[in-house]
Amino acid sequence: MKSILLFVSLSLVTLSSTFAQSAEEQTLIQLSMDKWQWMSDKDVDKLDKLFDAKAKFVHMSGTWKKDEELDIIKTGRIWYKKATVKDTAVEISGNTAIVWNRITLDAVVREQVAVTEFTVTEVYQKQGKDWKMLALTFSSVRDTHQIKH
């Protein structure tokens, strides 16, 4: 009976510490999901607040800075119609976080419909109370690609 009670007590302590550690991770996952929606909606005002002034964006056809990325989204040169997120992983180290999303992206690029499998790497930095995106990189992958957790 004592061993069962000890096991349950240790399990609860471990479980509660896991939830405490994952609050920031959940915030980042939600922020990443919101970002996909804002990109789809072409909501450059919200994206402008999220993207750090020195943010970089790496696509299959080039690398852009913040203002260029916002203009591409605003004008619809790339329309991120829908990102279907299949898996997400988060790692936090100090005030820096990396979010990996395994997605299928439905987009319109130069008036052509494109459906592409990506693993997207997002780098965030905690600045005051807010997370700011420093980098976003699209890596084209096979549909069987999995993120290591």
What label would you give each PLM region?
Residues 21-49, 54-149:
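A beta-strand edge to alpha-helix "cap/lid" segment located at domain peripheries
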Residues 1-5:
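Positively charged n-region of N-terminal signal peptides that target proteins for export
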Residues 7-16:
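Bacterial N-terminal signal peptides
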